Amino acid sequence: MSYEHCISGYTNFNENIHYFYQFAYLFTAICINYRILYVIWVSQRHFYRNQSFYNLYSVDCFTSVLAMSNELIFTRSFLYFPQLCVSFSEIVKNSPVFMRIYYCLLSYLIAIKPVIHIFIAVNRMSCVMFPVTYSQNWSQKLRIMLIVIFLAPFLVIWNVLISDNFIGYVNGGFGISYTRRVTWASLSLMQFTLIILTVLITMVTTTVTFYKMTTMKKRIKASERALCIAAALISVGFLLEAITQSFFAFFKEAPWLLDVMNYLRFATMDILFVGSPLVLLLVSDQFRGHVLGSRIGRTQRVSSINNTHSHIHHNTHHTMTRYSYFLWNVNK
């Protein structure tokens, strides 16, 4: 790493290729997250508005869209275009307000994801532990929880907010970092602590969740299993993030880490951003149906809505729906 000028010796084509293949999967993930937001907030709002899990998950999707857009437009453009390093770095260096806003926003978006996941994990546990009162309790307190989610990251990034920023040149490009005003409050150490806390809470809540599911009725167990599995799998991504943050927290001055630190950070970050929506789409047939428009999603949605009617009317309507659906398949 250099703090004075762009590092020469990097092939433009090779570095540009890194950007374009990362653009391919990150832009795809942005589109998927945008589609999920549209389903939860607009097209199927009447179905998801009272489901606290999906309300929390939509916040995660929204922050992921902002973070991935920030990565593509700024972070990785600065890093993977050596031919533009001199001109870009001069513009950024002379824009301290931009550097402050950019770095604070990036740090905030990275810090908020573990906080959201803590609430998602607790949400799944409370669903199986208190199935009768779960929905009402979370609906009443969701607004307070959202306020906590949006404010909690400031406990991690407060030193970033009051510190100065600078440009560091690495891998033919450059990145923006900060000079700690409070020397002991390292951002990497704060993020490592938060992610470790997230992993520990998730392990406890997931264990309790799966244990309680063994005592639940089969119908309820089947409906909740998908979301619980999704929350557990997403936790694996945070475990990988914890390992990466431990390198930055305890070995950041090591010469071997300087050459690979961006690749490590990008790899674990992208696993979380890209993997989270894919996991939920893979394990939940109903949600996948709404997002992708498949027939199973529409069928399950009809069944879910019909559950609000009386038992006799439900049985009659459901039978007619199945019969009409059968005739439609025969005649199509």
UniProtKB/Swiss-Prot annotation:
GO terms for molecular function: transmembrane signaling receptor activity. Keywords: Membrane, Transmembrane, Transmembrane helix. It is found in: Membrane. The chain crosses the membrane at residues 23-43, 72-92, 101-121, 144-164, 184-204, 231-251, 263-283. One of its GO terms (cellular component) is membrane. Belongs to the nematode receptor-like protein srg family. This is Serpentine receptor class gamma-3. It comes from Caenorhabditis elegans. The lineage of its organism: Eukaryota, Metazoa, Ecdysozoa, Nematoda, Chromadorea.
